[in-house]
Structures are given as C-alpha cells and as structure tokens.
Amino acid sequence: MSNVPADLKYTDEHEWIRTEADGTLTVGITDHAQSTLGDIVFLELPEVGKSVNAGDAVGVVESVKAASDIYSPVSGEIVAINEAATDAPEDVNGDAYGVWLFKIKLAAGASIDKLIDADAYSKLID
C-alpha cells in the first residue's frame, strides 16, 4: 500500500499539495505515482512566472516505463521550481513527499476546495 500523509491534499491525477505559511502551495507527485511510473529519469517543470489554470498540464515526468503529464492543481502563478529535482529526478523515487516539484501562488478567487484529502485519495488508489 502506498504512503499517503494525512496533512497533505491530493488530486485525482496523483499530485500532492502542501499549503505553506505564506499561502503558496507546494506541489509534488505522490508515492503511488512514483511507484507506478518506476525509475524516474527526467522532469520537465513549468517556467517561473507562468500563469496556469487548474488542470493545465504544466510539466512532464518521465520514467523508464512511461511519460506522464504533471497538472496544476489550482489556478495561479508558478513562483518557484525545484531545480535540484530536475538535476536528480531519481530522488522523487526515494522521497516522493520530500522532493517537491513547483510552488504556485493562488490566483485571486481561486481555491483549493476541489482538492481531496488523504482518506479520499487512499480510496482512489486502493
């Protein structure tokens, strides 16, 4: 069974989301996603400053088995990317919840209401 921390929010597309003290959201891929993909060999992340809508494909994660889009969980502006993750994408396999991919600032009027909690995500992947 995959590890699903209770303090995070999730998407149906297997991204995890952590709300930071300053209100920005930190986004990564779940343990289930990295396990399903296998050995991750490449990450393409969005550009800092880019405005995105919820559900937009903003990046790609490639493994030895497949390539999969990374989606924005909310509408907003990309404010940071984890360049260390692009340099060592295999680190996501070892610590999916410790290796974040990008940070996003919510757009005015956007919310996190459509994100799911750990219980709902656990049911989705079981």
UniProtKB/Swiss-Prot annotation:
Highest taxon in the source lineage: Bacteria
Stretches assigned to the Lipoyl-binding domain: 24-105
CDD domains associated with the record: GCS_H (cd06848)
Keyword Phosphoprotein tagged: no
Cofactor binding note of this UniProt entry: Binds 1 lipoyl cofactor covalently.
Alphabetically ordered keywords of this record: Lipoyl
Pfam families attached to this UniProt entry: GCV_H (PF01597)
Chain positions found as N6-lipoyllysine: 65
One GO term of the biological process aspect: glycine decarboxylation via glycine cleavage system
Cofactor needs: (R)-lipoate
GO cellular component, one term: glycine cleavage complex
PROSITE patterns tied to this protein: BIOTINYL_LIPOYL (PS50968), LIPOYL (PS00189)
HAMAP family: GcvH
Family: Belongs to the GcvH family.
Listed PANTHER family: GLYCINE CLEAVAGE SYSTEM H PROTEIN, GLYCINE CLEAVAGE SYSTEM H PROTEIN-RELATED
Function: The glycine cleavage system catalyzes the degradation of glycine. The H protein shuttles the methylamine group of glycine from the P protein to the T protein.
Subunit structure: The glycine cleavage system is composed of four proteins: P, T, L and H.
Name of the protein this chain belongs to: Glycine cleavage system H protein
Gene giving rise to this polypeptide: gcvH
